Amino acid sequence: MTLTHMNIIMAFSMSLVGLLMYRSHLMSALLCLEGMMLSLFVLAALTILNSHFTLANMMPIILLVFAACEAAIGLALLVTISNTYGTDYVQNLNLLQC
């Protein structure tokens, strides 16, 4: 495993730790999810380029498309929640509260 792969895996794990620690605000959770998706994209692209696996060339692009869709839906949800509740706390998303 090269140093580049270790750095990308460390970036993914730091984003995961950030998602687990800073989950009170929706914006910080979305930023951590975006960091995880981008590190997965870079890792997939580098792995495919290094292994010369030509059948999976489209996999990083598909992952990037899903990341863009996730970001768009997350930002739309953030705008809706901040307009409705006035804050972006994740506790406001509990549907079981009356």
Curated annotation (Swiss-Prot):
Bilayer disposition of the protein: Multi-pass membrane protein
InterPro entries: NADH_UbQ_OxRdtase_chain4L/K, NUOK/Mnh_C1-like
One of the protein's GO biological processes: ATP synthesis coupled electron transport
Family to which the UniProt record says this protein belongs: Belongs to the complex I subunit 4L family.
Role summary: Core subunit of the mitochondrial membrane respiratory chain NADH dehydrogenase (Complex I) which catalyzes electron transfer from NADH through the respiratory chain, using ubiquinone as an electron acceptor. Part of the enzyme membrane arm which is embedded in the lipid bilayer and involved in proton translocation.
Protein name: NADH-ubiquinone oxidoreductase chain 4L
Domain of life: Eukaryota
Cited PANTHER family: NADH-UBIQUINONE OXIDOREDUCTASE CHAIN 4L, NADH-UBIQUINONE OXIDOREDUCTASE SUBUNIT ND4L
Pfam families according to UniProt: Oxidored_q2 (PF00420)
